[in-house]
């Protein structure tokens, strides 16, 4: 082990540390960071070399953050990344600094948004917030309106998590939906992600995702938002139902097959006659 450590350059050590951090399960960033910190034993090297991993983790996980002075949380995503550690809160029309290690928002300031698409963004956000409130008690959503390749685009992100460290499990739901505002009909593209980690008497992770495509009728802002939510609700319900059914099937078949049906003697023990067995007599005489 010592020889291997001597062969690793600082760059290689940081690269390995960054991979551990990026793949930290939901709700376990601090635990992984502290373990990596002990292994690397060089705080300056870790902070300077793995800073990109802290940022990538928060972007990938749709980390929610509370901004002082504002009621609703906002998600940290690539769509709100303004560069130089600043992010956009489209609902409140502010930008703020975000510390990826401490996961804290500071210095909120007013910020310009895409006014040409703001009425569409607001309508979708209003409908999505009502949907999230109904289906995800701990959920947070952020809706962006952006011009991408010359097309006015709506991007809706949802995050919901349950962190139960005392019960040895943590989990997170993420979904991202996009559509462009074009006459008549448009294509809705979504990706749904579930990640759960269970670590009592073992180490099991569920990592699943599903890509979605559907067509959306475009009319006025409010009606289009309603039709969009119908697509989101149907797809997310179907996905969650499928995950539950697959889990039950695995419990009844795959996991059951891993358990030994009979002892190595291929004979079941009749516990009512245990004293007549040799082992029973030995236990009685012990």
Curated annotation (Swiss-Prot):
One of its GO terms (biological process) is actin cytoskeleton organization. InterPro entries: CapZ_alpha (IPR002189), CapZ_alpha/beta (IPR037282), CapZ_alpha/beta_2 (IPR042276), CapZ_alpha_1 (IPR042489), F-actin_cap_asu_CS (IPR017865). Keywords: Acetylation, Actin capping, Actin-binding, Phosphoprotein. The modification Phosphoserine is found at residue 9. The modification N-acetylalanine is found at residue 2. One of its GO terms (cellular component) is cortical cytoskeleton. Coiled coil: none annotated. Signal peptide: none annotated. GO terms for molecular function: actin filament binding. It comes from the Eukaryota. Pfam families: F-actin_cap_A. Disulfide bonds: none annotated. F-actin-capping proteins bind in a Ca(2+)-independent manner to the fast growing ends of actin filaments (barbed end) thereby blocking the exchange of subunits at these ends. Unlike other capping proteins (such as gelsolin and severin), these proteins do not sever actin filaments. Belongs to the F-actin-capping protein alpha subunit family. Component of the F-actin capping complex, composed of a heterodimer of an alpha and a beta subunit. Component of the WASH complex, composed of F-actin-capping protein subunit alpha (CAPZA1, CAPZA2 or CAPZA3), F-actin-capping protein subunit beta (CAPZB), WASHC1, WASHC2, WASHC3, WASHC4 and WASHC5. Interacts with RCSD1/CAPZIP. This is F-actin-capping protein subunit alpha-2. It comes from Plecturocebus moloch (Dusky titi monkey). The lineage of its organism: Eukaryota, Metazoa, Chordata, Craniata, Vertebrata. The gene is CAPZA2.
């Amino acid at each position: 082990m010592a020889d291997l450590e001597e062969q690793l350059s600082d760059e290689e050590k940081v690269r390995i540390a960054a991979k551990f951090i990026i793949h930290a399960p939901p709700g376990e960033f601090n635990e992984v960071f502290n373990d990596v910190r002990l292994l690397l034993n060089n705080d300056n090297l870790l902070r300077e070399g793995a800073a990109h991993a802290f940022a990538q983790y928060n972007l990938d996980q749709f980390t929610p953050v509370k901004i002082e002075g504002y009621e609703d949380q906002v998600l940290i995503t690539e769509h709100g990344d303004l560069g130089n550690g600043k992010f956009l809160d489209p609902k409140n029309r502010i930008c703020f600094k975000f510390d990826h290690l401490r996961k804290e928002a500071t210095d909120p300031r007013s910020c310009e948004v895409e006014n040409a698409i703001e009425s569409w963004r607001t309508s979708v956000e209003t409908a999505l917030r009502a949907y999230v409130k109904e289906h995800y008690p701990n959920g947070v959503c952020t809706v962006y309106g952006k011009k991408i390749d010359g097309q006015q685009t709506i991007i809706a992100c949802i995050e919901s998590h349950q962190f139960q460290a005392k019960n040895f499990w943590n989990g997170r739901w993420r979904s991202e939906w996009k559509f462009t505002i074009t006459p008549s009909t448009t294509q809705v593209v979504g990706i749904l992600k579930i990640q759960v980690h269970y670590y009592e008497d073992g180490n099991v992770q569920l990592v699943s995702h599903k890509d979605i495509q559907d067509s959306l009728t475009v009319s006025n802002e409010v009606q289009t938002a309603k039709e969009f939510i119908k697509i989101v609700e149907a797809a997310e319900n179907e996905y969650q139902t499928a995950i539950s059914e697959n889990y039950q099937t695995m419990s009844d078949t795959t996991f059951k097959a891993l358990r030994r049906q009979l002892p190595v003697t291929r004979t079941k023990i009749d516990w009512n006659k245990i004293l007549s067995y040799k082992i029973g007599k030995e236990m009685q005489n012990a």
